[in-house]
């Protein structure tokens, strides 16, 4: 099988794989065009009876002009007995293809991914092989980050955390030592500042002085009108008068307290119970009814 055209790009770079178009490789509305650019390729051929050796030789032949460093092919079996192949390919330089059929083996099409963690991907391919095939030597990719530089940055950050005494000082020190990170990750640094220097717990202070809420503008009015209201039944039990007389006396008290009738010189009720309650309006009446005492 002749190889399909590919283009090669030099230099380091992370690979990118996207959705493979359906319908014979034609891009349909809503789908993205296939593109692969990487040094490390991870392939999975589901339900593929081809042997690892045959598959490996075909892939190696297809990549013979691409400076291929290493190929590893393993075969595993599903629980239903169907075989599938895993293939890991390492190239010397980045290569790019826009053909979703580039790694097809006869009629078997693989799932194609750029292996962003080459060593872990190779280890995954080697986990439970029934058989395998190998070509070349795997070269562990170089880590771009300098260990010395990373250790120095960690040391600087530890010093900032140890020496800062407030949120503002912490953020100021971070901004001075790591200006770029401060600009693009300010929200994360603010979060860590809040964690390092939390607000002191606030002591609860009741908004109203009285424990019974009688000084509350709404609850206090409700207490006076509802909770401290004496029923005719309660008054008749205490004063030894009929319930009807108690109702008359309570109505008189209501008129007295709500309209200021006493100041206008209206004649008072002669009921003994009424005369007592006249001096016990509000919370005192509730205490009187509860304790049964007029003293």
Swiss-Prot record:
Key word Transmembrane helix present: no
Query: InterPro entries in the record, alphabetically?
Result: CRESS_DNA_REP (IPR049912), Gemini_AL1_MSV (IPR001146), Gemini_AL1_REP (IPR001191), Gemini_AL1_REP_central (IPR022692)
Q: What is this protein called?
A: Replication-associated protein A
Task: Give the residue interval(s) assigned to the motif RCR-2.
Answer: 84-86
**Which intervals of this chain are the motif RCR-1?**
42-45
Q: Could you mention a single GO BP entry for this protein?
A: symbiont-mediated perturbation of host cell cycle G1/S transition checkpoint
Q: Does the keyword Ion transport apply?
A: no
């Amino acid at each position: 099988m002749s190889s399909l055209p590919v283009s090669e790009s030099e230099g380091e770079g992370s690979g990118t794989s996207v959705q493979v178009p359906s319908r014979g490789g034609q891009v349909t509305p809503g789908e993205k065009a296939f593109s692969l650019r990487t040094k490390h390729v991870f392939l999975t051929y589901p339900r593929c009876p081809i042997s690892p050796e045959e598959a490996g030789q075909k892939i190696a032949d297809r990549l013979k002009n691409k400076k291929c460093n290493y190929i590893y092919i393993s075969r595993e079996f599903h629980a239903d007995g169907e075989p599938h192949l895993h293939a890991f390919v390492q190239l010397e330089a980045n290569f790019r293809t826009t053909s979703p059929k580039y790694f097809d083996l006869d009629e078997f099409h693989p799932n194609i991914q750029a292996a962003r963690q080459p060593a872990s991907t190779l280890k995954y391919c080697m986990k439970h092989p029934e058989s395998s095939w190998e070509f070349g030597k795997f070269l562990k990719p170089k880590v771009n980050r300098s260990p010395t530089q990373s250790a120095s940055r960690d040391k600087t950050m530890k010093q900032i955390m140890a020496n800062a005494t407030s949120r503002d000082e912490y953020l100021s020190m971070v901004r001075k030592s790591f200006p770029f990170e401060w600009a693009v990750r300010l929200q994360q640094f603010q979060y860590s500042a809040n964690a390092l220097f939390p607000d002191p717990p606030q002591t609860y202070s009741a908004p109203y002085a009285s424990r019974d809420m009688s000084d509350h503008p709404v609850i206090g009015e409700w207490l006076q009108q509802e909770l401290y209201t004496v029923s005719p039944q309660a008054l008749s039990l205490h004063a030894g008068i009929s319930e009807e007389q108690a109702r008359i006396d309570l109505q008189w008290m209501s008129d007295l307290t709500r309209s200021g009738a006493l100041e206008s010189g209206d004649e008072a009720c002669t009921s003994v119970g009424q005369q007592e309650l006249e001096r016990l309006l509000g919370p005192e009446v509730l205490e009187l009814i509860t304790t049964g005492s007029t003293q």
